[in-house]
C-alpha cells in the first residue's frame, strides 16, 4: 500500500513540475542593463538618461533584463530561438524603454530568467 501511495505522489509531483515549466507569463517593464542597475555604479541606471550607457554595456556583452513595472523586480532576459546570443539581440532596440514581453519563466538559485518568445513596445 505504501508503494502505491509513493507512486501516486511521485507522478503528481512530476506532473505539477512539468506543468509549471510550460507556463508562459507576460510582464511589462523597462529594459535595463543588469550590471549598472544592480551595482548602482551609474546612479539610478534607468530611463532615457541611461540609454547610451546601457546600449554600450549591452554591446559589450552585459546581459539585459526587465525591470518589472508592477513589482519592481528585476528579471534576467534570455531567449530560446538564438540562445548563444542571449536576449540582447532581441532587446537592443528597446533599451531604456517600456516593453511587454511574453515567455517562459524559470528560476534557479534565486535568479529568475524569462525565456522571451515575444517583445513589443508597451503602450
Predicted regions located by residue number:
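Bacterial N-terminal signal peptides
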Residues: 5-15
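OB-fold and OB-like single-stranded nucleic-acid-recognition modules
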Residues: 18-123
